[in-house]
Amino acid sequence: MIVGTVADLQGRVEVVLRIADQDDRTIECVVDTGFQGELALPPAIVALLGLPTGGRMWAKLADDSHASVPVFSADILWDDQEVRVTVMAMGSRPLLGTELLQGFNLSADFEEDGQLLLTPL
């Protein structure tokens, strides 16, 4: 089970990134059910972390436009397991998408400091 919080009416989950030759980094991500990828991080954070590049891919944005965005790989701790994910370098805040939510039930108490739970199906 993964436990998060609700703040400013947004579900949030902390994601631990495991990067070679660095200490683990914890990043708070907004759970975005409209984002079908795994993780999206602002380009400045991706650069700071020094993630290995994976090229570019097309992304459909919230305004229905399309953009070619750089992608990177990262290992994260997800429900106590190390998992390799694709990170899209885009946007202004870290997002966790539905590809990581597959196989989980999402429930949230939508009030300030409410609890968000991701439980395996």
Which stretches of residues belong to each language-model region?
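Pepsin/retropepsin-fold aspartyl endopeptidases
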Residues: 1-121
